[in-house]
Amino acid sequence: ELPIFAFTHCRDVVVAVSRAGGIGVLGAAGFTPEQLGQELDWISARLGDKPFGIDVIMPKKFESGDVPDLQSMIPERHKAWVEEVLARHGVAPLPADAGAGAHHGISGEQIGWTHELCRRLLDVAFGYPGVKVMVNALGTPPADVLAECRERGILVGALAGKVKHALAHRQ
């Protein structure tokens, strides 16, 4: 009804915006697939047939890879700098058994940056008829995701940091 989109991690905001005629878009990267299903159940129960969206973080260039691969890509000097900043400000280190994604609030899971992890989130989201928009925070999604969205009648949006990115999205 209105050209208003609200990107949020808060299900209450998704519902409020969609009820008001806009499109509430839930940021999914911080959830496990199970948690996302619970959030989408809650949203769907309150919106009925009103549309809403899901926002993922899926790099087109990383169509495979697991958490250790991504962790190994972080330069040691960056890790040392983060540790120094945390120590300087008195932030306690995480317990050794906290899991790879604990700093994102995800027990034992990496934030959904890989194709595999993000696909699991999308598989959950695509099971909800109210999901009418899928937005990728890292540009054009991989071809298989675009194809599935088209097949399901789901609109696709993507971040465009430069004009060349916006032009690429048109294709």
Language-model region placement:
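Active-site entrance/lid segments in N-terminal catalytic domains of soluble metabolic enzymes
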Residues: E1-Q171
